[in-house]
């Protein structure tokens, strides 16, 4: 997989290309990265890529020509078709399912905005999709781009040491993850649940499912509304709800 970022701050991406599981996978050649700086495609010797907005208003707007040239250059670096994504608070929310879809693609170009925004004509002519990481605003698209990259790359075979890690993450199964424990057996008076030390894999699996359902019901009940429950999940969920009703009564 080739991922390119159109950005005026290429160095910011060192954190994902050099460190952690994504950095290791990059060194192993499982995925490749290139930062494309639109300043190199500016039509002025100072490298300006922004200007005042027509109609007035605060801030500066990134100009279409250098961004378009940067995107077109990025496309030439691979024989595979590229999907161009603009990280924007106006885009569709990034979800696990979207990350799964993007992980299947061979070439992603991530457009990282700065200043007050990007000329709308560039978005209409060169961007395939706008994606948001949440209902809030940050100073630029680099951090959102890296969050998207991390979410996507951990789903690419070989990036994680054990693909089961990705499969058991929150949202992979449509519900939140269960609690996890490691040594010591007791910490500040809190002990590791006995079932996890029992060695009974069937009981452990059921406990983890029950805990995932309980956590989802308490923290993200909207996820359960979208989920088609299997009989075991329905049974466990009804038991949890009955416990909650007894506590409230």
Curated annotation (Swiss-Prot):
Coiled coil: none annotated. Its EC number is 2.1.1.228. The keyword Cytoplasm applies. It comes from the Bacteria. It catalyses: guanosine(37) in tRNA + S-adenosyl-L-methionine = N(1)-methylguanosine(37) in tRNA + S-adenosyl-L-homocysteine + H(+). S-adenosyl-L-methionine binds at residues 113, 133-138. Keywords: Cytoplasm, Methyltransferase, S-adenosyl-L-methionine, Transferase, tRNA processing. One of its GO terms (molecular function) is tRNA (guanine(37)-N1)-methyltransferase activity. InterPro entries: Alpha/beta_knot_MTases (IPR029028), tRNA_m1G_MeTrfase_C_sf (IPR023148), tRNA_m1G_MeTrfase_TrmD (IPR002649), tRNA_m1G_MTases_N (IPR029026), tRNA_MeTrfase_TRMD/TRM10 (IPR016009). GO terms for cellular component: cytosol. The keyword Transferase applies. Specifically methylates guanosine-37 in various tRNAs. Belongs to the RNA methyltransferase TrmD family. NCBIfam families: PRK00026.1, trmD. Homodimer. This is tRNA (guanine-N(1)-)-methyltransferase. It comes from Neisseria meningitidis serogroup B (strain ATCC BAA-335 / MC58).
């Amino acid at each position: 997989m080739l991922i390119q970022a159109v950005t005026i701050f290429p160095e910011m991406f060192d954190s994902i290309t050099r460190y952690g599981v994504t950095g290791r996978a990059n060194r192993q050649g499982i995925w490749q990265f290139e930062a494309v700086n639109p300043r190199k495609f500016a039509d002025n010797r100072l490298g300006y890529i922004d200007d005042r907005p027509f109609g007035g208003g605060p801030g500066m707007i990134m100009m279409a020509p250098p961004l378009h040239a940067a995107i077109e250059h990025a496309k030439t670096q691979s024989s595979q078709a590229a999907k161009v994504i603009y990280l924007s608070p106006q885009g569709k929310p990034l979800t696990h399912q979207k990350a799964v879809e993007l992980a299947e693609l061979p070439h992603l170009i991530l457009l990282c905005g700065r200043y007050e925004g990007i000329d709308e004509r560039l978005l209409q002519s060169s961007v395939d999709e706008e994606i948001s990481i949440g209902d809030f605003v940050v100073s630029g698209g680099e951090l959102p781009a890296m969050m998207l990259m991390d979410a996507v790359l951990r789903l690419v075979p070989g990036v994680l040491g054990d693909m089961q890690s990705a499969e058991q993450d929150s949202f992979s199964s449509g519900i939140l993850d269960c609690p996890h424990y490691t040594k010591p057996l007791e910490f500040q008076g809190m002990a590791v649940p006995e079932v996890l030390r029992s060695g009974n894999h069937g009981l452990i699996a059921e406990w983890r499912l029950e805990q995932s359902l309980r956590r989802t019901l308490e923290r993200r009940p909207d996820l359960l509304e979208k989920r088609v429950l299997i009989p075991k999940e329905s049974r466990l969920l009804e038991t949890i709800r009955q416990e909650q009703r007894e506590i409230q009564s």
